[in-house]
From Swiss-Prot:
Signal peptide (UniProt feature, chain positions): none
Gene designation: plsX
Naturally occurring in which organism (per UniProt): Pseudomonas putida (strain GB-1)
Subunit structure: Homodimer. Probably interacts with PlsY.
Protein name per the record: Phosphate acyltransferase
PANTHER family recorded: FATTY ACID/PHOSPHOLIPID SYNTHESIS PROTEIN PLSX (PTHR30100), PHOSPHATE ACYLTRANSFERASE (PTHR30100:SF1)
Pathway annotation: Lipid metabolism; phospholipid metabolism
Domain of life: Bacteria
Family: Belongs to the PlsX family.
GO molecular function: phosphate:acyl-[acyl carrier protein] acyltransferase activity
A Pfam cross-reference name: FA_synthesis
Enzyme class (EC, first level): transferase
EC number: 2.3.1.274
One GO CC term on file: cytoplasm
Length: 336
Protein backbone atom coordinates (compact mmCIF):
# COMPACT_ATOMS: atom_id res chain seq x y z
CA UNK A 1 0.00 0.00 0.00
CA UNK A 2 1.30 3.46 -0.89
CA UNK A 3 2.05 5.91 1.90
CA UNK A 4 -0.56 8.31 3.25
CA UNK A 5 0.80 11.65 4.44
CA UNK A 6 -1.27 13.77 6.84
CA UNK A 7 -0.39 17.21 8.20
CA UNK A 8 -1.48 17.70 11.81
CA UNK A 9 -2.12 21.12 13.33
CA UNK A 10 -0.51 20.10 16.61
CA UNK A 11 -1.23 23.37 18.42
CA UNK A 12 -4.99 23.59 17.84
CA UNK A 13 -7.76 22.60 20.24
CA UNK A 14 -8.71 23.30 23.82
CA UNK A 15 -5.96 21.33 25.55
CA UNK A 16 -2.80 21.93 23.55
CA UNK A 17 -0.63 19.39 21.77
CA UNK A 18 -0.30 16.57 24.31
CA UNK A 19 -3.44 14.59 23.42
CA UNK A 20 -2.99 15.41 19.72
CA UNK A 21 0.53 13.97 19.75
CA UNK A 22 -0.57 10.91 21.73
CA UNK A 23 -3.32 10.25 19.17
CA UNK A 24 -0.85 10.74 16.33
CA UNK A 25 1.59 8.25 17.86
CA UNK A 26 -1.19 5.69 18.32
CA UNK A 27 -2.24 6.03 14.67
CA UNK A 28 1.36 5.70 13.49
CA UNK A 29 1.77 2.48 15.45
CA UNK A 30 -1.50 1.06 14.09
CA UNK A 31 -0.99 2.03 10.43
CA UNK A 32 2.40 1.14 8.89
CA UNK A 33 1.67 3.09 5.69
CA UNK A 34 0.88 6.33 7.56
CA UNK A 35 3.29 9.27 7.66
CA UNK A 36 2.51 12.30 9.82
CA UNK A 37 3.79 15.86 9.84
CA UNK A 38 3.25 17.64 13.15
CA UNK A 39 3.12 21.41 12.74
CA UNK A 40 3.84 23.59 15.76
CA UNK A 41 6.49 24.53 18.30
CA UNK A 42 9.44 22.18 17.60
CA UNK A 43 10.95 22.04 21.09
CA UNK A 44 7.61 21.15 22.66
CA UNK A 45 6.76 18.56 20.03
CA UNK A 46 10.22 16.96 20.15
CA UNK A 47 9.78 16.38 23.88
CA UNK A 48 6.38 14.76 23.34
CA UNK A 49 7.68 12.29 20.72
CA UNK A 50 10.99 11.56 22.43
CA UNK A 51 9.95 8.06 23.50
CA UNK A 52 8.67 7.01 20.07
CA UNK A 53 10.06 3.80 18.61
CA UNK A 54 12.66 4.39 15.89
CA UNK A 55 10.57 2.76 13.15
CA UNK A 56 7.61 5.01 13.94
CA UNK A 57 9.79 8.11 14.43
CA UNK A 58 11.09 7.66 10.88
CA UNK A 59 7.53 8.24 9.65
CA UNK A 60 6.99 11.40 11.66
CA UNK A 61 8.22 14.85 10.72
CA UNK A 62 8.03 18.10 12.69
CA UNK A 63 7.56 21.41 10.88
CA UNK A 64 8.01 24.67 12.77
CA UNK A 65 5.26 27.25 13.20
CA UNK A 66 5.75 30.34 15.35
CA UNK A 67 2.09 31.30 15.76
CA UNK A 68 -1.08 29.69 17.15
CA UNK A 69 -4.64 30.70 16.30
CA UNK A 70 -6.73 31.06 19.44
CA UNK A 71 -10.09 29.34 19.76
CA UNK A 72 -11.81 32.72 20.15
CA UNK A 73 -10.02 34.61 17.37
CA UNK A 74 -11.99 36.07 14.48
CA UNK A 75 -11.42 34.28 11.16
CA UNK A 76 -10.40 37.58 9.54
CA UNK A 77 -7.69 38.06 12.16
CA UNK A 78 -6.41 34.52 11.63
CA UNK A 79 -6.41 35.00 7.87
CA UNK A 80 -4.58 38.32 7.75
CA UNK A 81 -2.65 38.52 10.99
CA UNK A 82 -1.03 35.10 11.48
CA UNK A 83 0.75 33.93 8.32
CA UNK A 84 2.97 31.54 10.32
CA UNK A 85 0.24 29.80 12.31
CA UNK A 86 0.34 26.02 12.73
CA UNK A 87 -3.09 25.77 11.09
CA UNK A 88 -2.11 27.73 8.01
CA UNK A 89 1.19 25.92 7.50
CA UNK A 90 -0.55 22.54 7.79
CA UNK A 91 -2.98 23.60 5.05
CA UNK A 92 -0.15 24.92 2.89
CA UNK A 93 1.53 21.51 3.09
CA UNK A 94 -1.60 20.05 1.49
CA UNK A 95 -1.70 22.79 -1.14
CA UNK A 96 1.96 22.22 -2.02
CA UNK A 97 1.57 18.45 -2.35
CA UNK A 98 3.66 17.68 0.74
CA UNK A 99 0.65 16.19 2.55
CA UNK A 100 -2.59 14.61 1.34
CA UNK A 101 -4.80 15.85 4.17
CA UNK A 102 -4.87 18.25 7.10
CA UNK A 103 -6.40 17.50 10.52
CA UNK A 104 -7.00 20.27 13.05
CA UNK A 105 -8.84 20.66 16.35
CA UNK A 106 -8.52 24.42 16.14
CA UNK A 107 -10.91 27.32 15.66
CA UNK A 108 -13.63 26.18 13.22
CA UNK A 109 -14.26 29.57 11.62
CA UNK A 110 -10.55 30.19 11.13
CA UNK A 111 -10.03 26.70 9.69
CA UNK A 112 -12.83 27.21 7.16
CA UNK A 113 -11.60 30.67 6.15
CA UNK A 114 -8.00 29.51 5.78
CA UNK A 115 -9.03 26.34 3.94
CA UNK A 116 -10.98 28.34 1.38
CA UNK A 117 -8.12 30.82 0.99
CA UNK A 118 -5.27 28.29 0.80
CA UNK A 119 -6.89 25.32 -0.97
CA UNK A 120 -9.78 26.97 -2.86
CA UNK A 121 -13.11 25.32 -3.60
CA UNK A 122 -13.81 22.80 -6.34
CA UNK A 123 -15.24 24.25 -9.57
CA UNK A 124 -18.99 24.82 -9.23
CA UNK A 125 -19.02 24.82 -5.42
CA UNK A 126 -19.99 28.11 -3.77
CA UNK A 127 -19.35 27.07 -0.17
CA UNK A 128 -17.69 24.06 1.44
CA UNK A 129 -19.80 22.15 3.96
CA UNK A 130 -18.93 20.24 7.12
CA UNK A 131 -20.10 16.62 7.15
CA UNK A 132 -19.83 13.87 9.76
CA UNK A 133 -21.27 10.41 10.39
CA UNK A 134 -24.24 10.21 12.78
CA UNK A 135 -25.18 6.80 14.30
CA UNK A 136 -28.68 5.55 13.44
CA UNK A 137 -30.70 2.36 13.92
CA UNK A 138 -29.64 1.28 10.44
CA UNK A 139 -25.96 2.16 10.83
CA UNK A 140 -24.88 5.71 9.98
CA UNK A 141 -25.96 8.70 7.97
CA UNK A 142 -23.86 11.57 6.69
CA UNK A 143 -25.16 14.88 8.12
CA UNK A 144 -24.27 18.23 6.57
CA UNK A 145 -23.81 21.15 7.10
CA UNK A 146 -22.60 21.11 10.71
CA UNK A 147 -21.88 24.79 11.26
CA UNK A 148 -19.76 26.17 8.45
CA UNK A 149 -22.74 27.92 6.80
CA UNK A 150 -25.34 29.32 9.19
CA UNK A 151 -27.44 30.92 6.43
CA UNK A 152 -27.92 28.89 3.25
CA UNK A 153 -29.70 29.42 -0.04
CA UNK A 154 -31.61 26.66 -1.81
CA UNK A 155 -28.68 26.33 -4.22
CA UNK A 156 -26.28 25.86 -1.29
CA UNK A 157 -28.46 23.06 0.12
CA UNK A 158 -28.59 21.45 -3.33
CA UNK A 159 -24.80 21.51 -3.59
CA UNK A 160 -24.50 20.03 -0.10
CA UNK A 161 -26.80 17.19 -1.17
CA UNK A 162 -24.64 16.46 -4.21
CA UNK A 163 -21.43 16.46 -2.17
CA UNK A 164 -22.96 14.36 0.60
CA UNK A 165 -24.19 11.77 -1.88
CA UNK A 166 -20.76 11.41 -3.47
CA UNK A 167 -19.11 11.19 -0.03
CA UNK A 168 -21.53 8.46 1.07
CA UNK A 169 -20.77 6.49 -2.10
CA UNK A 170 -17.05 6.81 -1.36
CA UNK A 171 -17.73 5.32 2.07
CA UNK A 172 -19.40 2.29 0.50
CA UNK A 173 -23.10 3.21 0.34
CA UNK A 174 -24.69 2.11 -2.94
CA UNK A 175 -27.20 4.63 -4.29
CA UNK A 176 -27.40 6.68 -1.06
CA UNK A 177 -30.80 8.04 -0.06
CA UNK A 178 -30.65 11.83 0.19
CA UNK A 179 -33.12 13.79 2.34
CA UNK A 180 -33.66 17.34 3.54
CA UNK A 181 -34.07 17.76 7.30
CA UNK A 182 -37.42 19.42 7.98
CA UNK A 183 -40.14 19.91 10.60
CA UNK A 184 -42.44 17.54 8.71
CA UNK A 185 -42.48 15.23 5.71
CA UNK A 186 -45.35 16.96 3.89
CA UNK A 187 -44.56 19.16 0.90
CA UNK A 188 -46.11 22.22 2.55
CA UNK A 189 -43.77 22.07 5.57
CA UNK A 190 -40.54 24.02 5.98
CA UNK A 191 -39.15 27.45 5.26
CA UNK A 192 -38.83 28.92 1.80
CA UNK A 193 -35.22 27.84 1.24
CA UNK A 194 -35.94 24.22 2.18
CA UNK A 195 -38.96 24.13 -0.15
CA UNK A 196 -36.94 25.58 -3.02
CA UNK A 197 -34.12 23.11 -2.37
CA UNK A 198 -36.65 20.27 -2.47
CA UNK A 199 -37.87 21.35 -5.90
CA UNK A 200 -34.27 21.44 -7.17
CA UNK A 201 -33.50 17.99 -5.77
CA UNK A 202 -36.67 16.43 -7.18
CA UNK A 203 -35.43 17.25 -10.67
CA UNK A 204 -31.78 16.30 -10.10
CA UNK A 205 -30.20 13.69 -12.34
CA UNK A 206 -28.30 10.91 -10.64
CA UNK A 207 -29.42 11.71 -7.09
CA UNK A 208 -31.61 9.35 -5.08
CA UNK A 209 -33.65 12.09 -3.39
CA UNK A 210 -36.25 10.63 -0.99
CA UNK A 211 -37.86 13.85 0.28
CA UNK A 212 -38.04 15.39 3.73
CA UNK A 213 -36.98 13.63 6.91
CA UNK A 214 -37.73 14.66 10.48
CA UNK A 215 -35.29 14.35 13.37
CA UNK A 216 -36.72 11.05 14.56
CA UNK A 217 -36.62 9.66 11.03
CA UNK A 218 -32.93 10.53 10.83
CA UNK A 219 -32.21 8.29 13.82
CA UNK A 220 -34.39 5.51 12.42
CA UNK A 221 -32.09 5.44 9.42
CA UNK A 222 -34.57 6.68 6.81
CA UNK A 223 -31.80 8.39 4.82
CA UNK A 224 -28.09 7.92 4.18
CA UNK A 225 -27.43 11.63 3.62
CA UNK A 226 -29.32 14.33 5.54
CA UNK A 227 -28.95 17.96 4.47
CA UNK A 228 -29.63 21.12 6.47
CA UNK A 229 -28.11 24.55 7.07
CA UNK A 230 -25.22 24.86 9.49
CA UNK A 231 -27.29 26.49 12.23
CA UNK A 232 -29.67 23.53 12.45
CA UNK A 233 -26.95 20.94 11.86
CA UNK A 234 -24.64 22.21 14.59
CA UNK A 235 -27.45 22.21 17.15
CA UNK A 236 -28.51 18.70 16.10
CA UNK A 237 -24.96 17.35 16.29
CA UNK A 238 -24.19 18.77 19.72
CA UNK A 239 -27.60 17.77 21.09
CA UNK A 240 -27.00 14.23 19.83
CA UNK A 241 -23.58 14.07 21.45
CA UNK A 242 -24.89 15.46 24.72
CA UNK A 243 -27.79 12.99 24.73
CA UNK A 244 -25.49 10.03 24.08
CA UNK A 245 -23.21 11.08 26.94
CA UNK A 246 -26.17 11.61 29.29
CA UNK A 247 -27.73 8.23 28.49
CA UNK A 248 -24.44 6.47 29.18
CA UNK A 249 -24.04 8.25 32.51
CA UNK A 250 -27.65 7.56 33.57
CA UNK A 251 -27.32 3.86 32.76
CA UNK A 252 -24.22 3.59 34.93
CA UNK A 253 -26.02 5.39 37.78
CA UNK A 254 -29.02 3.02 37.57
CA UNK A 255 -26.83 -0.03 38.02
CA UNK A 256 -25.03 1.39 41.05
CA UNK A 257 -28.11 1.21 43.28
CA UNK A 258 -29.12 -1.69 45.52
CA UNK A 259 -28.12 -5.33 45.40
CA UNK A 260 -30.62 -6.20 42.65
CA UNK A 261 -29.50 -3.24 40.53
CA UNK A 262 -25.87 -4.25 40.85
CA UNK A 263 -26.71 -7.87 40.00
CA UNK A 264 -28.66 -6.80 36.92
CA UNK A 265 -25.82 -4.49 36.00
CA UNK A 266 -23.29 -7.32 36.17
CA UNK A 267 -25.33 -9.20 33.55
CA UNK A 268 -26.28 -6.27 31.32
CA UNK A 269 -23.22 -4.04 31.61
CA UNK A 270 -21.07 -5.73 28.91
CA UNK A 271 -23.80 -5.18 26.31
CA UNK A 272 -24.51 -1.67 27.55
CA UNK A 273 -20.80 -0.83 27.42
CA UNK A 274 -20.76 -1.91 23.78
CA UNK A 275 -23.76 0.32 23.07
CA UNK A 276 -22.19 3.20 24.97
CA UNK A 277 -18.95 2.81 23.02
CA UNK A 278 -20.84 2.72 19.71
CA UNK A 279 -22.67 5.97 20.52
CA UNK A 280 -19.72 7.74 22.14
CA UNK A 281 -18.98 11.11 20.48
CA UNK A 282 -15.25 10.32 20.42
CA UNK A 283 -15.86 7.38 18.07
CA UNK A 284 -17.52 9.64 15.50
CA UNK A 285 -15.25 12.67 15.91
CA UNK A 286 -13.97 14.22 12.72
CA UNK A 287 -16.00 16.39 10.35
CA UNK A 288 -14.88 16.67 6.75
CA UNK A 289 -14.84 19.98 4.88
CA UNK A 290 -16.40 18.89 1.59
CA UNK A 291 -16.00 20.98 -1.54
CA UNK A 292 -12.34 21.96 -1.21
CA UNK A 293 -9.45 21.09 -3.51
CA UNK A 294 -7.92 19.05 -0.71
CA UNK A 295 -8.89 17.02 2.35
CA UNK A 296 -9.46 18.91 5.61
CA UNK A 297 -10.80 17.22 8.75
CA UNK A 298 -12.03 19.23 11.73
CA UNK A 299 -11.77 17.54 15.12
CA UNK A 300 -13.71 18.76 18.13
CA UNK A 301 -11.59 21.22 20.07
CA UNK A 302 -12.36 19.25 23.23
CA UNK A 303 -11.45 15.87 21.73
CA UNK A 304 -9.19 13.59 23.72
CA UNK A 305 -6.82 10.96 22.40
CA UNK A 306 -9.51 8.58 21.12
CA UNK A 307 -11.46 11.39 19.51
CA UNK A 308 -8.47 12.79 17.64
CA UNK A 309 -7.56 9.28 16.49
CA UNK A 310 -11.02 9.06 14.93
CA UNK A 311 -10.39 12.32 13.07
CA UNK A 312 -7.11 10.98 11.67
CA UNK A 313 -8.87 7.77 10.65
CA UNK A 314 -11.47 9.79 8.72
CA UNK A 315 -8.65 11.57 6.89
CA UNK A 316 -7.09 8.21 6.02
CA UNK A 317 -10.36 6.95 4.54
CA UNK A 318 -10.77 10.06 2.40
CA UNK A 319 -7.18 9.78 1.15
CA UNK A 320 -7.69 6.12 0.25
CA UNK A 321 -10.95 6.95 -1.54
CA UNK A 322 -9.42 9.97 -3.31
CA UNK A 323 -12.49 11.94 -2.26
CA UNK A 324 -11.79 15.43 -3.70
CA UNK A 325 -11.04 13.94 -7.11
CA UNK A 326 -14.16 11.77 -6.96
CA UNK A 327 -16.22 14.81 -6.08
CA UNK A 328 -14.71 16.78 -8.93
CA UNK A 329 -15.49 13.98 -11.34
CA UNK A 330 -19.18 13.88 -10.38
CA UNK A 331 -19.92 17.57 -9.91
CA UNK A 332 -20.04 18.44 -13.59
CA UNK A 333 -22.89 15.96 -14.12
CA UNK A 334 -24.87 16.79 -10.99
CA UNK A 335 -24.53 20.50 -10.35
CA UNK A 336 -27.02 23.00 -11.74
Amino acid sequence: MSAQIIAIDAMGGDFGPRSIVQASIACLSATPSLHLTLVGQPSLLEDLVSGLAAADRARLQIVAASEVIGMDERPSQALRGKPDSSMRIALELVRDGKAQACVSAGNTGALMALSRFVLKTLPGIDRPAMVAAIPTQAGYCQLLDLGANVDCSAENLYQFAVMGSVAAQALGVHRPRVALLNIGTEDIKGNQQVKLAASLLQNARGLNYVGFVEGDGLYRGEADVVVCDGFVGNILLKSSEGLATMIGARIEQLFKGGVLSRAAGAVAMPLLKRLQADLAPARHNGASFLGLQGIVIKSHGSAGVQGFQSAIQRALIEIQENLPQRLHGRLEDLLL
